[in-house]
A protein has these predicted regions:
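Positively charged N-terminal leader segments that act as targeting/secretion signals
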Residues: 1-4, 8-10
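Compositionally biased intrinsically disordered regions enriched in Thr/Gly
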Residues: 15, 42-44, 67-70, 74-78, ...
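An edge-strand/N-cap motif at the start of beta-rich repeat modules
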Residues: 44-88
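Repeated scaffold domains used in trafficking and secretory/extracellular systems
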Residues: 54-56, 92-100, 127-134, 161-168, ...
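Short loop/turn segments that connect beta-strands within beta-propeller blades
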Residues: 82-83, 117-118, 151-152, 189-190, ...
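A short beta-strand motif characteristic of beta-propeller blades
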Residues: 86-90, 121-125, 155-159, 193-197, ...
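Solenoidal tandem-repeat scaffolds enriched in leucines and small polar residues
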Residues: 146, 157, 162-176, 181-258, ...
C-alpha cells in the first residue's frame, strides 16, 4: 500500500507541473474540469473509511439573534426571535450573539457595552472594544489599556495591562510595555498572575503548557503553576501543540519539530512549518521562487499529502482543505479546494472556492455562484439551504444564519426567509434610497446607491447613472465597456474589490453621500481604501464641485493652499505627510462639508503613508467666510 501511495504522489506532482503550464492560457472552468477528471479515482478510495469521531458538546439553545436594518443613519442592529419578530429595537451600530450567560456585546455611539436578553444595559457603552467572550471572560480595551470582564460583565479589579490576549485553556497572555520593549506573562481566570510578567514573548496556553521566550536562543514551556517544565536552546521555537513544537537551529530556518523533552522528532528540512493539529502539520520544502507549494505530514514526519498544493487549511474535526492554483498569477495564485481527512484520504473533487471550519459535523462551502452546507464527507447537504452568493452558513439555535456577500440574514431549514435586511430605505417622505447589488464575479462586489422619488424621471436616471459610474473601481489594465469594468463571471481576478456607501448628510433635497471601497491586489502587504464623496441637489440632479462653494471672483484656491500648508508645517498631527507631496488644490479635489466646516481629504499614498489612512484637513467656514459664496445654491442648500 505504501508503494501505491508513493506512485500516486509521483503522478500528482507530474500533473501539477502540467497544470502550472496551462493555467495561464486556459479558461477557469476548463482547469476545474481537468483537475476533477484527474482526481476522480483518487478521491473514491476513502469513502468507506471509518474515522474516529469526537464527541460533540451540545450548546445552549439561542433564542435571540442579531439582525441588520439599513437606515439613512447607517447600519442599525437589533435582535429578532426564531420567527423573525423584532424583540430588541434596531438602535445599535454593531451587535453580536448572546453568549451562554445571557449577555451580548453591542456598539453604540462608537463605544462597546453589554446588554441582557431584555435589551437592558448590563454594562453601558464605555469601552473602545470588547472581544467576544471565551471561557467565560471577555477582553476589553479602554483608553489604550486592556482589562477583563467576568461572566456577569464585571471588571476584574486590578487587571490592567498594555495587552491581554484571549483566554485559552484557562489562561491569557498579558504584556507590559516599557518604551519600545514589552515583557510578557500569564494571568488566570481570576486575573491573578501565575508568573511574573518578565519574558521576551509568550504564546497562548495549549494542552496545559504555555511556550515562552526567556532570551535569545532560550525558550521554555511553562505549566499552569508558572513553573518551567523544560528549556530549549534553539534560534527559534514556536507553535506548541499536541506535544510537539516547530524549531530551527539557524535564524530563518530550515524548520523541524521537537518534543517536550527537547528531542528532535522531525529533522529541520522545511522552509516553512506549521503547528500540529488533528495529528498532522502543514509543511513546505519549496525552493521555487515562482510558487510555494505545501504538503501535510504526520507526527513521524511521514508524508500524508505531497507538497503540491498552493494552499492548505485545517478545517477541524480531522478535515483539511487542499488547494490547487488557478488563474494566471503564478506568484500569489488563488486556489480551488478539495476536502481531505487527516489520514490522507481525498474526500471530494477540487470544486470549492471557499470552505469553512467544521462544527458538529457540518461545514459550508462556496463555488462561483452559491454557498451550501457540507457534511463530514464534504458532500453538499441536500436537505439544508443552498443560497446565491458567497460567504458563510451556520445552523444557529434551530434556524440558519447566512452571512452572504457581507449581508446577514436568517432562513429556516426549508430555505424560507425568516428575516433579511431591507434593500430600500427612506430619506424622507419624498425620496428613498435603493441598495443595488453589482457582482459580476465572486471577487468583485459593489453595493450601489440609487435614488428613488426624483420628480423628473430623466433627472433621476441621470443621477443614478452617475452614482453607478462613480461607484465602479476599475484597476489598471482592466477593460471598460459602456462605462463598466469588463469583468467575466468565471474570470480568475488577481485582486479583490468590495464597495459600499454611507450617507454623510441629507436635508431638503440635498444629499451628501460617500462611495467607499477597498481594493486588494493578491500578495500585497495592504489594500487600498477608495473614497469618493458626492454632493447632490436632488431637484436639479446637479453634482456640486468644490469651486461651487466659493465666490468666482476670489482666489479661494490660494487661501485653501495656504491653510493646508500651514497644517502640514505647524501641526504635529500631520508630521507623517510626505515632504513636498502637497501640490495644492486640484480641479477634481475630493471634499465634503457639514454645517460648519469644509473637509479636504486625500487617499492613502497620495500625500502620506498607508498607515496614515485617508488624510483629512478640517477647515472651519469661519476661517474662509470672506471667500464663501453664502448666497450660492451649494452653500444655501447645505447650510441654509
Amino acid at each position: 500500500m505504501e508503494v501505491l501511495r508513493l506512485i500516486r504522489i509521483f503522478f500528482v506532482k507530474i500533473f501539477i507541473l502540467n497544470i502550472y503550464n496551462i493555467v495561464s492560457n486556459k479558461k477557469y472552468k476548463n482547469i476545474i474540469y481537468i483537475i476533477n477528471e484527474f482526481s476522480r479515482g483518487y478521491m473514491n478510495r476513502g469513502k468507506n473509511n471509518k474515522q474516529s469521531k469526537k464527541k460533540n458538546t451540545k450548546k445552549r439553545e439561542v433564542d435571540l439573534f442579531p439582525a441588520l436594518k439599513n437606515t439613512v443613519d447607517g447600519d442599525r442592529y437589533g435582535y429578532i426571535n426564531k420567527d423573525g419578530e423584532v424583540i430588541i429595537p434596531f438602535k445599535f451600530t454593531r451587535a453580536y450573539d448572546f453568549n451562554e450567560f445571557g449577555l451580548a456585546i453591542i456598539k453604540e455611539n462608537n463605544k462597546f457595552g453589554l446588554i441582557d436578553i431584555k435589551g437592558n444595559y448590563n454594562v453601558n457603552p464605555q469601552f473602545d472594544n470588547i472581544n467576544p467572550y471565551k471561557e467565560g471572560r471577555a477582553i476589553y480595551t479602554e483608553k489604550s489599556k486592556m482589562g477583563v470582564l467576568d461572566e456577569k460583565g464585571n471588571k476584574l479589579r486590578g487587571v490592567v495591562y498594555d495587552y491581554i490576549g484571549n483566554y485559552n485553556d484557562g489562561y491569557a497572555v498579558v504584556a507590559k510595555m516599557n518604551g519600545k520593549s514589552s515583557k510578557y506573562g500569564y494571568i488566570d481566570l481570576d486575573g491573578k498572575e501565575i508568573t511574573e510578567v518578565k519574558y521576551m514573548h509568550a504564546n497562548d496556553f495549549n494542552d496545559g503548557f504555555g511556550l515562552i521566550k526567556i532570551k535569545d536562543r532560550e525558550f521554555a514551556l511553562i505549566d499552569t503553576q508558572g513553573n518551567i517544565s523544560n528549556t530549549y536552546n534553539f534560534e527559534y521555537v514556536g507553535s506548541y501543540g499536541e506535544d510537539l513544537m516547530v524549531f530551527s537551529i539557524l535564524l530563518g530556518g530550515p524548520y523541524g519539530y521537537i518534543n517536550r523533552d527537547g528531542e528532535i522528532v522531525i529533522s529541520p528540512i522545511y522552509c516553512d512549518a506549521k503547528g500540529f493539529n488533528d495529528g498532522v502539520a502543514v509543511v513546505s520544502r519549496s525552493n521555487n521562487n515562482i510558487i510555494c507549494t505545501h504538503g501535510v505530514i504526520d507526527k513521524l514526519g511521514r508524508q500524508i499529502y505531497g507538497e503540491i498544493y498552493s494552499d492548505i487549511k485545517h478545517l477541524g474535526e480531522g478535515k483539511i482543505a487542499l488547494g490547487l492554483p488557478i488563474g494566471d498569477n503564478s506568484i500569489f495564485p488563488r486556489s480551488i479546494y478539495a476536502i481531505g481527512d487527516s489520514l490522507g484520504t481525498l474526500l471530494t473533487k477540487f470544486i470549492y472556492l471557499n470552505i469553512g471550519m467544521y462544527i458538529n459535523g457540518l461545514s459550508y462551502g462556496s463555488d462561483d455562484k452559491k454557498t451550501f452546507f457540507l457534511d463530514r464527507y464534504g458532500r453538499i447537504v441536500k436537505n439544508l439551504p443552498m443560497v446565491d452568493g458567497s460567504g458563510e452558513l451556520r445552523a444557529k439555535g434551530g434556524i440558519i444564519h447566512a452571512n452572504i456577500d457581507y449581508s446577514p440574514y436568517y432562513l429556516d431549514k426549508n430555505n424560507k426567509f425568516i428575516y433579511q435586511p431591507n434593500k430600500e430605505f427612506p430619506l424622507d417622505k419624498k425620496y428613498s434610497l435603493i441598495i443595488d447589488k453589482y457582482k459580476p464575479n465572486i471577487n468583485y462586489l459593489i453595493y450601489i446607491p440609487q435614488v428613488k422619488g426624483i420628480h423628473d424621471e430623466n433627472v433621476e436616471k441621470e443621477v443614478n447613472s452617475k452614482l453607478r459610474k462613480i461607484s465602479f473601481y476599475i484597476p489598471a489594465k482592466e477593460e471598460v465597456i459602456d462605462n463598466e469594468p469588463n469583468i467575466i463571471e468565471d474570470q480568475v481576478l488577481s485582486y479583490n474589490y468590495y464597495g459600499n456607501f454611507q450617507i454623510l448628510f441629507y436635508k431638503d433635497n440635498s444629499l451628501i453621500i460617500d462611495l467607499l471601497g477597498y481594493y486588494y491586489s493578491l500578495g500585497a502587504v495592504n489594500g487600498t481604501p477608495i473614497r469618493k464623496t458626492c454632493a447632490i441637489d436632488l431637484l436639479t440632479g446637479r453634482f456640486y464641485k468644490l469651486k461651487d462653494l466659493f465666490k468666482s471672483d476670489t482666489n479661494w484656491r490660494a487661501i485653501l493652499n495656504k491653510i493646508i500648508s500651514g497644517f502640514i508645517e505647524n501641526d504635529p498631527s500631520y508630521e507623517y505627510v510626505f515632504p513636498g507631496s502637497f501640490k495644492g488644490i486640484s480641479e477634481s479635489q475630493d471634499f465634503y462639508i457639514d454645517k460648519d466646516n469644509l473637509y479636504i481629504y486625500y487617499p492613502p499614498y497620495k500625500i502620506g503613508p498607508y498607515s496614515a489612512g485617508v488624510i483629512t484637513f478640517k477647515i472651519p467656514f469661519t476661517q474662509i467666510e470672506d471667500y464663501l459664496n453664502s448666497q450660492g445654491d451649494f452653500y444655501k442648500k447645505f447650510n441654509g
